[in-house]
Amino acid sequence: MRGTRAAQRYAKAILSLAKDKNSAEAVNEDMISISKTVVNSRDLENMLTSPVIKDSTKKSALLEIFKDLNTITKGAIDILLENGRIGILHLVARQYIIKFNELNNVRQAVVTTAVPLDKELEAVILSKVKELTGSEASLKSVIDEDIIGGFVLRVGDLQYDASVSRNLRRLERELKDNTYVSKI
């Protein structure tokens, strides 16, 4: 993906400054908000990457959308605008979140289910992930009706697949491989 290396460098610098100013948590909240908003708004992403729209317009739009930004986050937006890199703002935000979580030993857990999870079940899953990994986790929920039922949990490079579709595939494979012929 274009701009990923630059996004990592900007995120690292922003995190370093935020740690020095004891604002890493507040900046992380800003970055979560920025990441979600830009990813969910194609128009905003197009505006940020457009070479036709002036930087002053981009800045005023961002400050209008994100009214309560930390001064460090506002400064990061200014630097990205000055350097002509505002188009990678969402990548910088995503990289900041990743680096912040690494710093605080928080792992990303992705749970895939056929139906949305309720808050109680999310809490149970998070406690199990913490129990298994020994570190805090943030949960990202993905809906995929193809798994039919059950869930697939991924934490880092570990995966636990308890989906109905996996069990059906396993059963199908066992039935095909079964060489037992009953005697009549």
Curated annotation (Swiss-Prot):
GO terms for cellular component: plasma membrane; proton-transporting ATP synthase complex. Coiled coil: none annotated. It is a peripheral membrane protein. The keyword rRNA-binding does not apply. GO terms for molecular function: proton-transporting ATP synthase activity, rotational mechanism. Pfam families: OSCP. PANTHER family: ATP SYNTHASE DELTA CHAIN. This is ATP synthase subunit delta. It comes from Christiangramia forsetii (strain DSM 17595 / CGMCC 1.15422 / KT0803) (Gramella forsetii). The gene is atpH.
